[in-house]
Amino acid sequence: MESEQIQVNCPTCGKVVIWGEQSPFRPFCCKRCQLIDLGEWADEEKRIPSDTELSDSDEWSEEDPLKH
């Protein structure tokens, strides 16, 4: 029985990517598309939805930096 190759679309450009060792940047087709996606997350163009809005000051206290 021959196993089928799983194919996915690159989330950045839509090009078909074979899911396997021959595609080291999977699910992306290349390093460029991977870096474009990383940049979108870094610029906060993409984010995981949340019910609450936290700011940096809500999480960290300058009074006791070792507390967290």
Curated annotation (Swiss-Prot):
Quaternary structure annotation from Swiss-Prot or TrEMBL: Interacts with GyrB.
GO biological process: regulation of DNA-templated transcription
Biased composition (Acidic residues): 53-68
Protein name in UniProt: DNA gyrase inhibitor YacG
Family matches, as NCBIfam families: PRK00418.1
Record keywords: Metal-binding, Zinc
Spans annotated as Disordered: 45-68
Family the entry assigns: Belongs to the DNA gyrase inhibitor YacG family.
Signal peptide: none
InterPro entries per the UniProt record, alphabetical: DNA_gyrase_inhibitor_YacG, Znf_NHR/GATA
A matching Pfam family: YacG
Amino-acid positions noted as binding Zn(2+) in the UniProt annotation, renumbered to this chain: 10, 13, 29, 33
Function: Inhibits all the catalytic activities of DNA gyrase by preventing its interaction with DNA. Acts by binding directly to the C-terminal domain of GyrB, which probably disrupts DNA binding by the gyrase.
Cofactor binding note: Binds 1 zinc ion.
Highest taxon, organism lineage: Bacteria
Annotated GO MF terms: DNA topoisomerase type II (double strand cut, ATP-hydrolyzing) inhibitor activity; zinc ion binding
